[in-house]
Amino acid sequence: MEDTLPRNFRGINLGMVLEELKTVLMEDALFNFRGDRDVSFLPAREESLVETTGLSFVKRAFFQLREGELFIMAFTLNTDLVDHYSIFTSLVEKYGQPNSLNPRQAVWETETTRLALERPLTVKYIDMTVFNEIIDEAATVESAEIRSRQEFLDGF
């Protein structure tokens, strides 16, 4: 699949900075964003999490930022107003068949973007470049911990 997957939803773009995200959320009537009280900082991981409720079609929205830039956005949709089949059909019409499909989720993926439709009804956009960096960093830390543990055990 070519890199044709969207990296934005209603003016919210993967890669945008926190202040831009807050401005867009404040101006969009689909979200009930309350400003800084909807923002949590995770200093140990240089990450921020913005969680807000939505109005009408969106029940909840989550935005995860790393080093100040948005890399995951997830929208839990209101199943009273929209259904899984309608969203799935719309995504297939726009982006073709998913790269992977199972009872829990449908995933469209390119080198830079993952778009996932999860059950019961959540749509996620993920910046794969940042996501893969996090996975690589975690593997490096785990490898160092394993080595350290082995060195400790070898001391006996």
Residues of each region from the PLM?
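Mid-chain, structured segments of secreted extracytoplasmic proteins
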Residues: 44-82
